[in-house]
Amino acid sequence: MKPMTSDVMPAAERKVRVDLAERSYDILIGPGLIAAAGGEIASRLKGRKMAVITDENVAPRYLEPLMASLAGSGMDPVSLILPAGEKTKSFEHLIPVCEAVLGARIERNDAVIALGGGVIGDLTGFAAGIVRRGSRFIQIPTSLLAQVDSSVGGKTGINSPHGKNLIGVFHQPDLVLADTAALDTLSPREFRAGYAEVVKYGLIDKPDFFEWLEQNWQAVFAGGPARIEAIAVSCQAKADVVAADERENGLRALLNLGHTFGHALEAATGYDSKRLVHGEGVAIGMVLAHEFSARMNIASPDDARRVEMHLKTVGLPTRMADIPGMLPPADRLLEAIAQDKKVKGGKFTFILTRGIGQSFIADDVPSSEVLSFLEERIPR
């Protein structure tokens, strides 16, 4: 794999810069960043009032050290603890978050802090984006998925019965603190789910990185330098795409590899994390995207098999049959896909591939082909 372009910092930390002119920000990666958060924030923001939003799973481990770090740096923090899980990304919980931010009297130089995984980051970022027409926002992601994907790039939002992430705004954070020590407390399933997003970056346009993951995934799972390297490469990859296409007018859509199928499967399971979590849906979706590309004679079936083999080796689901319980029929899944992506003249936009690391945007995929493909793969 080619060397990373992100800066090397003391104590095995990495720094990745998201270049968005006056809205540029740093992603700091390494152990101990939650305890050091107060100093990092104080060096960047003038405000002293902080509203910390977290969930009931993360709070017992990390809320107290974060609050102590903020207070120790002269800040006045308040906190709100929400239920954990995908169903928290809803209007029901958005309103209390907004009220908590207003109640904390957060002003222009103060900040809202998301302490948790992707759900907390997306929800909190949305609240920060709409309260006072935009408040400063800091991401402290505690899951692998959030560290390499959802905390970077400014996409925020909540789910709807019509589909995932359909209500939201673009609102960039002022800082991302990815404390890699927090990943040591994740369940194996949570870590694997986040790893699917790491693999995605190799499959989009970094075949050398995918090959490196095939050879080094065990070291990534074990922790240490390989894990930090994988996170830093992933963050740099996303930062480069976001800098080139912040509002997803073109290139950024490539980051949706596996997500069109994956989001439809999440909706089909009612966002029930016992059946399917986001990263698992992405894993299945990436295999489906490669298989569909092969079906359309765009890619080799060998590439789809290689992707499936790696994801299966690390313990991720790769087939719709791996999802517990019944799935709806193909036409219902197609309806969910239609909500997730724009349909023009009966044709879908998908991220397809010509091979490992050769993904591209296809905006003329016939819905009839997708329906036929799904009918073949839904377990009977």
Curated annotation (Swiss-Prot):
| CDD domains, per the entry | DHQS
Give its E.C. classification number. 4.2.3.4
Pathway given in the UniProt record: Metabolic intermediate biosynthesis; chorismate biosynthesis; chorismate from D-erythrose 4-phosphate and phosphoenolpyruvate: step 2/7
Catalytic activity field: 7-phospho-2-dehydro-3-deoxy-D-arabino-heptonate = 3-dehydroquinate + phosphate
Q: Which domain of life is it from?
A: Bacteria
Q: Which cofactor does it need?
A: Co(2+); Zn(2+); NAD(+)
> Looking at the UniProt record for this protein, which Gene Ontology cellular component terms does it annotate, in alphabetical order?
cytoplasm
Q: Subcellular localization, per the record? A: Cytoplasm
In this chain, Zn(2+) is annotated as bound at 197, 259, 278
Q: Where does NAD(+) bind?
A: 118-122, 142-143, 155, 164
Q: Which UniProt keywords apply?
A: Amino-acid biosynthesis, Aromatic amino acid biosynthesis, Cobalt, Cytoplasm, Lyase, Metal-binding, NAD, Nucleotide-binding, Zinc
Q: What is this protein called?
A: 3-dehydroquinate synthase
Q: Name the protein family.
A: Belongs to the sugar phosphate cyclases superfamily. Dehydroquinate synthase family.
Q: Which GO terms describe its molecular function?
A: 3-dehydroquinate synthase activity; metal ion binding; nucleotide binding
Q: Which organism is it from?
A: Sinorhizobium medicae (strain WSM419) (Ensifer medicae)
Cite the PANTHER family for this sequence: 3-DEHYDROQUINATE SYNTHASE, 3-DEHYDROQUINATE SYNTHASE, CHLOROPLASTIC
The note describing how and how many cofactors are bound reads: Binds 1 divalent metal cation per subunit. Can use either Co(2+) or Zn(2+).
Gene Ontology BP term (one): aromatic amino acid family biosynthetic process
NCBIfam families from the UniProt entry: aroB (TIGR01357)
